[in-house]
Amino acid sequence: MELNIALGRALRNLRSRRGLSQDAFALVSSRTYISQLERGLKSPTIEKIEQFATFMNIHPASLIIGCYLERSPDEDLQSLFEKVRTDLDFDLSMSKDEPTEK
């Protein structure tokens, strides 16, 4: 599944579960744009993802994670979290070894 379509489905699911209509997003975007995103016709910027997440009172990563769960329905949330945790733990341990700038 294409990322645009998966992200659109994740956005629609998160929006619907919160009982929000596309029109409710008028403060952050047009209904037309939301519709295009949900159908996979457009790709939002990271800034727009953050605006949507703030409006829905969720973390922006929730929308991104939802996208990848939509894209790979055989992958469960726990295994995805474990992969992300491993990636971030590795990066954090590497950054501790780097000298700090003054």
Regions found by a protein language model. Name each.
Residues 9, 13, 27, 36, ...:
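DNA-binding alpha-helical recognition surfaces that contact promoter or target DNA
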Residues 11, 22, 31, 46-49:
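Helix-turn-helix DNA-binding elements, focusing on the entry/boundary residues of the two helices
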Residues 1-17:
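A short, Lys/Arg-rich alpha-helix, primarily the initiator
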Residues 47-63:
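DNA major-groove recognition helix of helix-turn-helix/homeodomain DNA-binding modules
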Residues 29, 38, 48, 67:
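DNA major-groove recognition helix of helix-turn-helix
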Residues 18-36:
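Short alpha-helical DNA-recognition segment
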Residues 65-102:
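Short, charged recognition helix plus adjacent turn
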